[in-house]
Amino acid sequence: MIAARLSARQPASIKFHFPYPTGGHCDDACNWEANDKHSTTLISEDAQSAVLKRTLDATTYYVTISWEGPAKLSEKSANYFVLTPTDSIFTFTCQFTPQVSASPILTFTEVQQVSSGHWKNYWTQGAVADFSQCTDVRAKELERRVVLSQYLLAIQCAGSTPPQETGLTYNSWFGKFHLEMIWWHQAQFALWGHPELLDRTLSWYETVEPIARQIAERQGFKGIRWMKMTDPSGLEAPSKVGSFLIWQQPHLIYLAELLYRANPSEELLRSEER
């Protein structure tokens, strides 16, 4: 969501410029020279909203843009659209979905209210570092870094799937999840008093369990063998060594234990037994 007060002398516009992925191991993931390999199509538009259809190889998703105030959406070139407001105050929201949204997306004000409530709960209902009584001259900077890390981990590593190794900051390891790293990214949620954020991701393990059982069977093992480098589908990413690594295997057990310590209930035990 974005809200801005605009100048008539310097009108601002919002660019929607879509790249093709590089497929690189470690880069910004943006290939701006491959417009022939993907497309962006305006499939609907009215005075206050528009829907773009994105197609990359076998993947399709939709970008819904909604704005308040007069504005014009124009196509500048392939995969490049610009939204230009004509009023002095302008707000808009943007939503990315696998299908066309069946209901209107939230307005700027609605997103602002939800976001404000979320962060108020995050900072007041969990733990936070306080080194104000420390006499070491480094204490203030250390506290700043700890609190900043709590924020950065919350915005990048608390989704419905495991985060990639560098979160949303950068594209590394082809943008894949590395399940041995999920402990470092997410164990801290339960320890800071936010077990619900950890639980949000752990449900992903249930959806990919059948694939993990197939991996174990293929390799001659009983039970489950969690994939090392993967994506939302749970399939193994190509790797010379990834399929043979085992350091990601115990993480789910320990993370489930953290959830139980935060909420020792029979219901949680039954859900984890599944």
Tell what function each PLM region has.
Residues 128-136, 171-176, 238-243, 258-270:
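The substrate-binding groove and active-site-proximal loops of carbohydrate-active enzymes
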Residues 1-176, 195, 205-213:
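Acidic/polar, glycine-enriched structural segments that form the non-catalytic walls/loops
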Residues 128, 151-154, 184-197, 251-265:
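Well-ordered alpha-helical scaffold segments within catalytic/enzyme domains
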Residues 179-224:
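Carboxylate/His-rich catalytic cores and anion/metal-binding grooves
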Residues 273-274:
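Conserved small/polar residues in nucleotide/adenosyl-binding loops
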Residues 219-222, 245-258:
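Core alpha/beta catalytic barrel or barrel-like domain that forms the active/cofactor pocket
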Residues 144, 176-183, 190-193, 243-251:
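Aromatic- and histidine-enriched alpha-helix N-cap/loop-to-helix transition segments
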Residues 162-175, 226-242:
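Acidic/His metal-coordination segments adjacent to aromatic residues that form catalytic metal sites
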